[in-house]
Design a protein with these regions (language model features):
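Conserved active-site segment of CheY-like receiver
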Residues: 8, 79-83, 103-105
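Short hydrophobic/Thr-rich beta-strand motif most characteristic of the beta2 strand and flanking loop
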Residues: 25-33
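C-terminal output helix
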Residues: 87, 105-114
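Acidic, metal-coordinating helix/loop segments flanking the phosphotransfer/catalytic sites
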Residues: 32-48
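Conserved phosphotransfer microenvironments
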Residues: 48-67, 80-84
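Conserved acidic segment of CheY-like receiver
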Residues: 1-11, 16, 20, 49
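The C-terminal output helix
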Residues: 115-121
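As written
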Residues: 92-98
Length: 121
């Protein structure tokens, strides 16, 4: 399965690519912006998007929810340092396709969150 990396931090992308490519059956693809993300999801929406919302060009939770409705088979792992409690509450209450993981999480938790998103249908 291809994991889409929507994170503008080079070091985070490099680290996630390294971790994911060590996991069996997974590969990564970096998407630069929302347009590229939507093109990749049109090709195959049954995928996981690891998204740093705070650094990506998605404007608000409403826009992210529209993407979730447009691509209902996509699993979203919000991977960030700074998400407001209200933002997280809105997303989690709106769809079970969203997961949240802090960038400061230990490696075992990061791997577990990725595997959870991949295995969830």
């Amino acid at each position: 399965m291809k994991i889409l990396l929507a994170d503008k931090q080079d070091i985070t992308r490099a680290g996630l690519t390294y971790v994911i490519e060590k996991m069996e059956g997974l590969e990564t693809k970096y998407v630069e912006d929302k347009t590229e993300l939507m093109l990749a999801l049109r090709e195959n929406e049954d995928t996981v998007v690891i998204l740093d919302y705070t650094l990506f060009d998605i404007n608000d939770s409403a826009e992210l929810l529209i993407l979730n409705q447009r691509f209902p088979y996509t699993r979203w792992l919000l991977f960030s340092e700074d998400l407001s409690a209200d933002f997280v509450r809105v997303l989690i209450a709106s769809s079970s396709m969203f997961s949240v993981l802090l960038k400061e999480s230990p490696l075992t938790e990061i791997k577990e969150a990725i595997r959870f998103c991949v295995d969830r249908k």
